[in-house]
A protein has these predicted regions:
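Short, high-confidence coil segments that cap the C-terminus of an alpha-helix
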Residues: 54, 80-84, 145
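Short aromatic/hydrophobic "clamp" motif used to bind/position activated sugar donors
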Residues: 57
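Residue-level recognition of beta-strand->loop/alpha-helix junctions
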Residues: 34-36, 88, 151
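N-terminal anchoring/stem segment of glycosyltransferases
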Residues: 1-53
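Short, surface-exposed basic-aromatic patches at helix termini and helix-loop junctions that form
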Residues: 23-26, 49-51, 73-79, 142
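C-terminal catalytic/acceptor-binding lobe
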Residues: 130-234
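Conserved catalytic core of nucleotide-sugar-dependent glycosyltransferases
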Residues: 65-139
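Catalytic metal- and UDP-sugar-binding loop of GT-A-like glycosyltransferases, i.e.
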Residues: 60-62
Length: 234
């Protein structure tokens, strides 16, 4: 089966982040199609799905990297078995606080699944209360299809505005590790976060993922200890 691995970067993306992303991908011998274009994220996903000749599509943010080659290969294998795969996320700002979905930070879908879901658009839709790529999971849930989400286990720092609740599961934030398989920085526009990404990428390529900073446990209760962006019910 033909697999297409894709990463989008905009002209204002931090060059150091993009270069370290490429370093990790090269280290694992992962062939990535990098698109350098100022295009809406969802529109880029839609265009890729409709113009690239592939059976399986992997979308990965420029600040999201696998901790191993096995992590990527396992996700692709799940996709071959009929699963929709991605990092677990919710979007608190659109009244969908408990609506977990496979986020586009790391997202895997087959062409067959895409057509079976009715070729939904990845563009965010306020009427449907969906964020980027969320409609894919919404449709998969409605059709009772197989879904595999990678859940956060630790994070490194507090985002501007406070840490994020993941429905009833726990919390996530800057430098989140998912299932010890993927790492997503978030908020790369802030220079203080870039160093965390560089440090993590260096640990990955040196084979020392055990040395990655995992300061905060995602399932611990941080209410009253760390600022929370959207404290449900208050």
């Amino acid at each position: 089966m033909k697999v297409s691995i894709n990463t989008l970067s905009w002209s204002n993306n931090n060059v150091e982040v993009v270069n370290n992303h490429k370093m990790v991908m090269d280290h694992f011998h992962i062939p990535v199609n990098y698109t350098e274009e100022n295009i809406n994220h969802g529109m880029w996903i839609d265009r890729t799905l409709n113009t690239v000749d592939a059976d399986i599509f992997v979308f990965m943010d420029s600040d999201c990297v696998p901790l191993s080659r096995v992590a990527l290969d396992e996700s692709i294998d799940y996709c071959k078995r009929g699963y929709l795969i991605g990092n677990a996320q919710v979007t608190n700002c659109i009244s969908a606080k408990h609506d977990l979905f496979c986020a586009p930070s790391f997202f895997v879908i087959s062409k067959e699944m895409y057509f079976a879901l009715g070729k939904p658009s990845a563009v965010n839709n306020n009427d449907r209360r969906t964020d980027i790529a969320q409609e894919f999971t919404r449709r998969a849930v409605e059709q009772e299809r197989r879904i595999k989400m990678h859940y956060p286990t630790s994070f490194q720092g507090v985002p501007q505005g406070g840490i994020w609740r993941l429905s009833g599961y726990g919390y996530y934030g800057i430098g989140t590790v998912y299932d010890n398989k993927f790492y997503h920085l978030y908020q790369t526009r802030f220079a203080k976060n870039v160093g965390l990404f560089v440090d993590t990428c260096n640990h990955i390529v040196s084979g020392n993922i055990g040395g990655i900073n995992r300061q905060y446990d995602c399932k611990s209760e941080w209410a009253g200890v760390l600022p929370i962006e959207d404290d449900y019910g208050y």
